[in-house]
Amino acid sequence: YYMYRARWNEHQHTTHLLPHWNWKGREGQVTPVYCYTDGVEGELFVNGKSQGRVRKDKSSRLDRYRLRWNNVKYEPGEIRVVTYNQYGEKVGEDVKRTAGEPAQMKFSVETPDHEPIACMVEGCTDEHNVLLNADGNDLAFITVSLLDKDGNECPLADDELTFEVKGAGTF
């Protein structure tokens, strides 16, 4: 998705770092890091230490659409990428952090048109005020993420969650 988004989205810059940064037991082992971006260059930091700058290479099938750091050694903490355009101006930044145990849920709600809408889920703090009609025509995508106590996503969490719809909506 992010590779394509970086190419077609003319209204917002794309900078997406992967993989997640939760690799217990891989400390000190090489863990490649990639970034999909509409920028042409990026600098990667592991716990604040630069891993160098890399540029996209249009002549390389593997490097024309992404930035790659193939020799990064995993250590818990934070990876951060800063991306730049052809003029050296910063266009984006993304961060992945090693997460603790799941402690809270985050709800994101949007329509098929990617319009954020009011989150009517108990515990949701979304501030948007577009409402859906239970007329069989409106649709919302609800994404639930588990976060640790510091708000970091827990990508390896496999907790079983149960949801219930109240009112005229269906699930």
Tell where the protein language model's regions lie, with residue ranges:
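Substrate-binding clefts and catalytic carboxylate motifs of secreted carbohydrate-active enzymes
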Residues: 1-119, 128-131, 149-153
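A structural signal for short, hydrophobic beta-strand segments that form beta-sheets
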Residues: 17, 170-171
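Broad gene-expression machinery/nucleic-acid interaction feature
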Residues: 32, 141, 160
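Flexible glycine-/small-residue-rich
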Residues: 37, 146, 165-167
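Short loop/turn microsegments at loop-to-beta-strand junctions
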Residues: 39-40, 141-143
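Short, well-ordered beta-strand segments
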Residues: 49-51, 158-170
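Extracellular Ig-like/FN3 beta-sandwich strand-entry sites
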Residues: 74-78, 137-139, 158
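Surface-exposed intrinsically disordered loops and tails
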Residues: 124-126
